[in-house]
Design a protein with these regions (language model features):
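A short, hydrophobic beta-strand-centered structural micro-motif
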Residues: 38-47
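Charged, amphipathic alpha-helical segments and their flanking helix caps
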Residues: 1-24, 47-137
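Short acidic low-complexity segments
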Residues: 27-39
Length: 137
């Protein structure tokens, strides 16, 4: 049976490719390995659940694309806002890599995507939710 560690390793491997790593100015991380003080464009992979003891195994993973906020002047006031254009271009590449991936015996689909604010670190991130359906041990 697979474990969430296996899912994290699979997604990490799919995204640790030059088309991604040379496009961002940060790194690809697993779990809580991302430095707390990172100000880079980083991608973080984590899995939140995976059934055990029976097939098919059903699970959920996240791919979080972090992008530092960008200063913008709105109505004469300087503010930090999401850099949506950069988030979109990185997310496009991540989704493209995920969609073209073939992992024998495993099936995953991109279930949803949303943008979330991390105001404490002055960054926004795109959360890409992945659903797994694993038919083999």
């Amino acid at each position: 049976m697979k474990q969430t560690f296996d899912l994290d390793s699979i997604i990490y491997g799919l995204l640790s490719v030059p088309s991604i790593t040379t496009f961002i100015n940060g790194e690809v991380y697993v779990g809580d390995d991302r430095p707390e003080d990172s100000v880079c464009e980083d991608i973080v992979v984590n899995s939140i659940d995976l059934t055990q003891d029976y097939l098919p195994q059903i699970g959920t993973s996240n791919v979080n694309v972090y992008v530092p906020d960008k200063p913008r002047r709105i109505k004469g006031k300087q503010q930090l806002k999401a850099c949506r254009q950069r988030m979109k271009s990185i997310t496009d590449k991540v989704v493209s890599e995920l969609k073209k991936a073939v992992v024998p015996g495993l099936k995953f689909t991109i279930e949803s995507q949303t943008v979330l604010n991390e105001s404490d670190i002055k960054q926004h991130y795109v959360n890409i939710r992945i659903s797994w359906n694993i038919q083999t041990e």
